[in-house]
């Protein structure tokens, strides 16, 4: 009996192979789409997390408004839970490339003599690592949206418009590009904010430690112990890092005030030293002036010895030489007095400025930043979460279409085999024995479809979507592994839906008696439709049009399945075109309707226009543009 049923099932598949394949492929498409999109977000998060961990990107970045000292770094390293620390000097400056384009550049001075670094490592894509202090490697993403981006061999020169810190602390005015790298600290083409140049970082450069000469550190990068075992984008990681952040902020409150006191003491000593120098300088100038005046008096006395001069030539020659020396001394003393007075005034002004700067030193503060505070990390997380949100909606359409196809296919298959089903019922087969054949039919198609869908979906969809985001982020290729947890969730839902559609198709036949099933099924009765009550319209329709209209309402199940299927497919297409058009319009709406300007100038003082006559004249001149003032404080 079992052998006969098995043969009957296989015979049924061969006789309706097209229907079997249609169910198989629609299930493969639905399951693959659902599984693939559901795996996209975890795959993208896992890929980025693996990249950050592999190149040892910092967990926390500590900055200080007054700088960090070696004592601060040692105090950070002694906190329980800190695995590794790396102090660094980071400075934003404006560099000019060989095309005379100014590039706001963030310079990371964290490479040792071998060009290596303990934290924040990077992958060398082209060229070599820096060997001297005037060489650098640059982030590869700079070549995408930066005009005339630097290439290997180009020389970058410190711009005159760069800030004072760059001129003071840069050991060289030029940097030669010797390599191109990719770093997990700079995964996004979205530019980080900056206080130099245009206000946004256009280029990231990595140099040797000796390039920046300040006696303090601007940053202290650290790894938290056991954080590498957690997913960077998970809530567990965030909570774990927040605990360490709280410890660092507590330490920062103490260390920042100590740093402020240290700077105040150093400043006071320097001011006292400058004041002492100025006092001694004034004393020396006063003494030289008195000596010059005494020499002048003595020179006047030589006039009384004129007769003696005329009578004694040798004495006359000596007195002439003496008079000349006195004259030179008088002239030099006069000039020195004027120069000294100007220098004293400059010293007084410098001391006053230093005192004002000393008085302006606040208590200072530590800025504790995590990976989540970087622009690239935040944007990447937001975009992946958007993909995750779309994955919760789009696969439902494919799943619904798969159910409709299965229901339609199985309904027609069962209707065609009414006579066979009636014969089997008359021979004493139970309903489950009869319809088990069709359940196995749809089950085998669903299982094979899920297997094919999983094999393709887990690889195809995450890879394609990740590649699409490749234009915005510099990340390594994705592995896209098979995810059993998602497969075990999608497979029962898909297979259960197909089986439910099959049982629903069998239900109406189960209620019929064998005699009714062995007879051909009577066609659905025709009914008058609404259009027939409009003679003017009905009479002008052809016979085919009338039959079509009647059949639409005669077979309501087919009508609704067709409508729902077409509606779902149309909705998917409309959504796709809508997303494309919406993205294409962003740039136009941003700069054509919202930001109606080509240049933005930020002033430190809201009263700058009123106080600066030159600026006011420039803005009110007959320039071929319109000027609107809006101020914000810095």
Model-derived features: where do they sit?
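N-terminal Sec/SRP start-transfer signal
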Residues: 1-35, 45, 413, 439, ...
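Membrane transport/envelope proteins' first extracytoplasmic loop
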Residues: 2-400, 431, 471, 586, ...
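Short cytosolic juxtamembrane segments of multi-pass membrane proteins
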Residues: 3, 512-529
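Alpha-helical transmembrane segments of integral membrane proteins
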Residues: 22-33, 388-408, 442-453, 486-490, ...
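Juxtamembrane/interface segments at transmembrane-helix termini
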Residues: 41, 45, 49, 502-515, ...
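Small-residue-rich transmembrane alpha-helices
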Residues: 407-412, 417-419, 443-475, 484-511
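Juxtamembrane segments of multi-pass membrane proteins
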Residues: 543-634
